[in-house]
Amino acid sequence: MSKFVPYPLFHDDMPIDISFVFESERPAGKHGFMHTAGDHFEFEDGTEARFWGVNFNGGACFPSHEYAETVADRLAKTGCNIVRFHQLDAEWDSPNIFSFSRGKRLGSTRELDPRSMERLDYLVYCLKERGIYSYLDMLTYRRYKTADGVAAAADMIDSTKYPFNCFDERMKELQKEFMSQLWNHMNPYTGLCYKDDPAFVMTEIINENDLFSKPNFTVEPYTSDFRRLFRAWLDRRGIEFDAEGCDLTAKDGVLAEFKTELEREYFAEMRDYMISIGVKIPITGTNWFFSDALTRAHVDMDFMD
C-alpha cells in the first residue's frame, strides 16, 4: 500500500476547499484601509491584518474574465488572501500595462492601455469579492522610450540594470505620472478609484533597483549627473573627496553615506507624492535588502518587504 496520499495540483481547481473558513472576511476591504500599528498591520476597525499570498507576474495580471474568476476561486480555496501584482510594466510579456498585444512598436510608455486595464480591473474585482487583497508594484521592468523624453533611452534596453531611476529628474517625473494614472484610475467593476479602494493594502515604489545592488554607472549623461550631485553633497559638508575620479562602485564609507541619503530622499519624494494624490495605504521603497545602507534608506517608509 502506498504511503503517499494523492494531492494533484490542477491549473483550474484545488483538491481541497477551505474558503468557507474565511467567508466572513468577504469582500476584501470590509475592515477599512490598512495602516501600520507599531510592529504589525491593522485595519481601520482595529482588526489585525495578516496575509498569505502569491505573486502574479507580467501577463498573468491581465487574464480573460473567465480565467480571472477561475483563478480567484482557486486561490480562495487554498486560503490565500493577498496577490502582489508584479511586472505590470514588463515589455517582454503580453499583455502588459502599456500594450495589450504585440504588434506595433510602442513610441512611448506614458499611457496605460485601456484593454489591459479593463482586464486588471476585473481581476481585482474578482479577488476582492472573494476576500483577497491586492499589493501593487509601481516601477519594475518599464523600458523607457526616446519619446518619453528620457536621455539615452536606446542605450538602456534593460532599465533594471541601472540605478538612474533613483536620481534622474525626468525618470522621477515619469514615475509620478504613472503613479497618478494608476492610483486615480476608476475601476468600473468596484466603482472606486484604486486609491479609494481598501482592497489595496500595500505598495512599493520600485522593484529590486537601487544605488547599491545596481552600481552600473556606464551610461551618460547619468554618470556625470551622479558625480555632480555627489560633488555638491561633498561641498555642503566640507568633505575632501575625489568625486570626479573615484570608482562609483567602490565600497567606500563616504560614497555609501551619499548613496544612502540620495536613496532615502528618492523614497521620501515618491512616498510623499503618492500620499499627495490620495494613496492611503502603507508604502515601502523596494523589496530587497542587500546592505545595511539600503536598510537605513528605508527609515521613513511604512514597512520593509
Give the residues covered by each predicted segment.
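N-terminal pre-domain segments of enzymes
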Residues: 1-31
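Active-site mouth of glycoside hydrolases
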Residues: 29-304
